[in-house]
Regions:
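Rieske [2Fe-2S] iron-sulfur-binding domain
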Residues: 1-40
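C-terminal catalytic domain of Rieske-type non-heme iron oxygenases
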Residues: 28-266
Length: 266
């Protein structure tokens, strides 16, 4: 596909149309990395998520569900809720907290990206287990924040890939893709594995996702009250601060480029 304009219906109505100069505009770059496709439309202000992206998805994972919806919220509120465990006990007192911990995470920073680990209480079974071939499968939830708008989450029985597309300061379009877990030997998932993945996704949809959405929508509604000029984050929420620092850094770089005097001849 070279993007050239090949055909125009009723082209006699456009006698002076130069097809060679009216094709598609090429994008700057297309990168396939960690099972994700990154399309850079214009000259980038920096490497962004590609600066240090870990391996995330494998070829043997099967997509079994997808969803697209819009919410009247700012995308950052949803992102922030996935980057800390401070909210687990008050937000999920019956769904998640009985199986997890109160305000306990392991946070890793990877360039502008981050990975947040939410351990289940059953991880304590590994305390005295042999270190050889130790696996965290079904022992933790891992949220990989792909700077700035995406996340890849490994849950107990499935993966969730989420993309946010901001449409306004108070409206966001979300795309969600659910996949099976990787198979250790690289084979195809069985019907039993697929059934467990679907059951896990349904449980999350009926419980945690609804509880998170309620809190986020309440925060969004409260912003309009004017009672607070800003929100404060504690030391437990370092991944949120990391996201905002990198947003500020990249926006400052973009602003500098947009307001720099153009160079003659370029």
């Amino acid at each position: 596909l070279d993007g050239q304009l090949e055909y125009v219906p009723h082209d006699h109505g456009f006698p002076n149309l130069d097809k060679d100069n009216n094709g598609l505009v090429p994008v700057h770059a297309v990168n396939i990395q960690s099972g994700l496709v990154f399309i850079t439309q214009d000259e980038p202000v920096g490497p962004g998520a590609l600066e240090s992206l870990p391996d995330l998805l494998s070829d043997d994972q099967v997509l079994f569900d997808s969803d697209e919806h819009e919410d009247n919220i700012n995308w950052k509120l949803t992102a922030e809720g996935t980057l800390e465990g401070y909210h687990i006990k008050p937000t999920h007192p019956e769904s998640f907290f009985p199986y997890g911990y109160d305000n306990l995470n392991v946070i890793e920073l990877q360039g502008p990206n981050s990975r947040v680990c939410f351990p289940f209480r059953r991880i304590e079974k590994l305390r005295d287990a042999p270190r050889e071939n130790l696996s965290l499968d079904r022992m933790v939830t891992l949220v990989n924040r792909i700077f700035p708008f995406a996340s890849v989450t490994r849950l107990a029985q499935h993966y969730n890939v989420s993309l946010a597309e901001p449409e306004s300061p108070t409206r966001t379009r979300y795309f969600s893709y659910k996949l099976t877990l990787p198979i250790p030997d690289g084979g195809a998932p069985t019907e039993e594995i697929l059934a467990r993945a679907k059951k896990d996704a349904a449980f999350l949809s009926d419980t945690g996702n609804k509880e998170d959405a309620k809190v986020v929508s309440d925060i969004q509604a409260a912003i309009g009250s004017g009672a607070n000029t800003h929100y404060q984050f504690g030391r437990f929420e370092s991944a949120i601060g990391h996201l905002h620092r990198n947003l500020a850094r990249y926006l400052a770089q973009l602003n500098e480029i947009e307001h720099s005097p153009s160079v003659p001849g370029i």
